[in-house]
Amino acid sequence: MPTNDWAAEFNQRAAGSMIADHGTNFRTVTAERAVLELDFKPSLTQLTGIFHAGAIIALADEACTALAAAHAMGEGGWDPAKFPLTVQLSANLIRNTNRGTIRAEATPLHRGRTTAVVRTEVRDQDAKLLAVVTATLVLPSAGAKSG
């Protein structure tokens, strides 16, 4: 599967999941860059009407995972046995918003055979930085036994 098809694949596979419930849209997903967007809506807010930190962090984690998946699966097509799992995540929440669309852009810091480290910046519709998230993901190999 060509790398430019991963965004459509993720949007399709997200149907019925928490990702779809939130309204996440995978815009670009390659092994070099993943861009996801999320529109503001009241169900994603905390008590004062701004984005809930969990919604921002979930979007960033989805971007990290998508990029790592594109790396792990390569051109071979969708393989659940190669789907990466976040094992560590660090988030710095810098500001917040109560309107518009937020955008997460993930880039790789390290892509190995068994792990990936991905950095994601989340920005508001005015390109103001909302959060910086770094995640370490384990890359299971196809056919590996889980325990």
Which residue ranges define each predicted feature?
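Terminal targeting signals and extreme-terminal segments of soluble enzymes
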Residues: M1-G147
